[in-house]
Amino acid sequence: MGNMPITVLIDSEILAEIYQEARNSFPNECCGWLCGEKSGNKVTVVRKCINAQDSGTHPTVSERTAETAYVFSGEDVLDLNKSFDSDMPAMIIYHSHPNGKAYLSETDRQVATSPWGDGPAYPVQQLVIGIDNHQIVSSAQFAWSEDENEFVEINQYSGAAI
């Protein structure tokens, strides 16, 4: 095993903002991305997205709803791509799991990985927030590992009573 991926830092204020968004979206999944200075390794801005899973405008499996999946709108995907050429690029894509579990599901892994299997679909890490009826249970951060050729968990965060 060689190099571990570098952890992009998320401070407590950013986590609190995302956790509140997860609560406001519950029982649906929330989604968006976190931006930071191109030269740094810390996110400072939350860019919330509308979960377009139920919009009927995306070619995903129809039995999935916004309670079990998320998808960015076309406009959000364009904005995400534009961010990579800016001074404040997206560094982490986040979404919530209303089942209370903070893990990168098989579907999450497929969506986050390049369709050619040669790395991540976007040059970002992933953050998954586990939320249930009563609280934010926890969240977990994942990064692409060149050594393992897949996303690996690199950090866990405590939940919150919201």
Model-derived features: positions:
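Conserved beta-strand-loop surface patch within small alpha/beta domains used
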Residues: 1-90, 99-162
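Single, functionally critical "micro-switch" positions that shape active/binding sites
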Residues: 96
